[in-house]
């Protein structure tokens, strides 16, 4: 299994952020796309990049620059020809690959607390869904996944709705499961809005104003995340990770503010 982690030993003691790439790309590409964030946060956080479990064709947004950087991976189905996997198996694979990325970083000598999830596009959807599962377990059972206490999420171009990451949780209405394509192009999306699936773990949302999926990203922000715990950055870009210093600086500032708010420092 391949994961990409920061190789700078000076960061091994720092709080860690687990990073989930988009669909049709991979951890190596996402690390390159996040180079501005890595540079700006290198003295404060260790960013660890997890690889998704499932093989995929390349996403159209990576072909122009990263066409030779395969193989490409995905967390969820995003095309009809992707094999249907039982949802419980899909969730188990996602959890396994995330746990292995975290364990590999432990073996590399890192000791910092896992404080946040950072995801782009499909990785942001999965990150938000994982945070919602953590919140649901805490509320229903007074516990959370073993060893996991993500304090906040950084959601870049994340799309609603959440997906169900635990078939044992009885939710009303039920969320789409991890075997489904949830691109919000179908009328059933209305079932999920305003129905109580609200994430209260703090989140930072980063939206490109020229992103074709902007309306769907705003749905995640407006309809699925609590007003008192959500933050928003809008920048002049399309479906990609901010790279210019002025845009990256805004994201870094808000990450620092979330860290203060959630007691990281």
Swiss-Prot record:
The keyword Hydrolase applies. Its EC number is 3.1.2.-. The keyword Hydrolase applies. One of its GO terms (biological process) is monocarboxylic acid biosynthetic process. Keywords: Hydrolase. Esterase; part of the cla gene cluster that produces clavatol and ortho-quinone methide. The clavatol biosynthesis cluster cla and the terrestric acid cluster tra are both involved in the production of peniphenones and penilactones. The non-reducing PKS claF is responsible for the formation of clavatol from successive condensations of 3 malonyl-CoA units, presumably with a simple acetyl-CoA starter unit, and 2 methylation steps. The esterase claE probably collaborates with claF by catalyzing the hydrolysis of ACP-bound acyl intermediates to free the ACP from stalled intermediates. This is Esterase claE. It comes from Penicillium crustosum. The gene is claE.
């Amino acid at each position: 299994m391949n994961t990409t982690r920061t190789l700078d030993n000076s960061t091994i003691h720092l709080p860690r952020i687990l990073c989930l790439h988009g669909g049709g790309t991979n951890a190596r590409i996402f690390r390159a796309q996040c180079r501005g964030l890595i540079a700006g946060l290198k003295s404060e956080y260790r960013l660890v990049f997890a690889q998704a479990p499932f093989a995929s064709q390349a996403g159209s947004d990576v072909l122009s620059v990263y066409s030779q950087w395969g193989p490409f991976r995905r967390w969820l189905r995003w095309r009809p020809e992707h094999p249907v996997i039982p949802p419980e198996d899909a969730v188990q694979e996602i959890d396994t690959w995330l746990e292995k990325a975290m364990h590999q970083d432990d073996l590399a000598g890192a000791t910092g607390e896992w404080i946040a999830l950072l995801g782009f596009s499909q990785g942001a959807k999965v990150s938000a869904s994982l945070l919602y599962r953590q919140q649901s377990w805490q509320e229903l059972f007074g516990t959370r996944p073993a060893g996991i206490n993500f304090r906040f999420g950084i959601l870049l171009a994340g799309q609603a709705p959440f997906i169900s990451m635990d078939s044992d949780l009885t939710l009303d209405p039920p969320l789409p499961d991890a075997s489904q394509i949830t691109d919000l192009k179908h009328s059933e999306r209305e079932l999920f809005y305003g129905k109580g699936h609200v994430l209260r773990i703090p989140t930072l949302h980063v939206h490109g104003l020229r992103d074709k999926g902007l309306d769907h990203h705003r749905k995640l922000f407006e309809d699925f995340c609590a007003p008192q715990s959500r933050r928003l950055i809008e920048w002049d870009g399309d479906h990609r990770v901010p790279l210019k210093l002025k845009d990256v600086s805004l994201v870094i500032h808000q990450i620092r503010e979330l860290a203060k708010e959630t007691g990281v420092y």
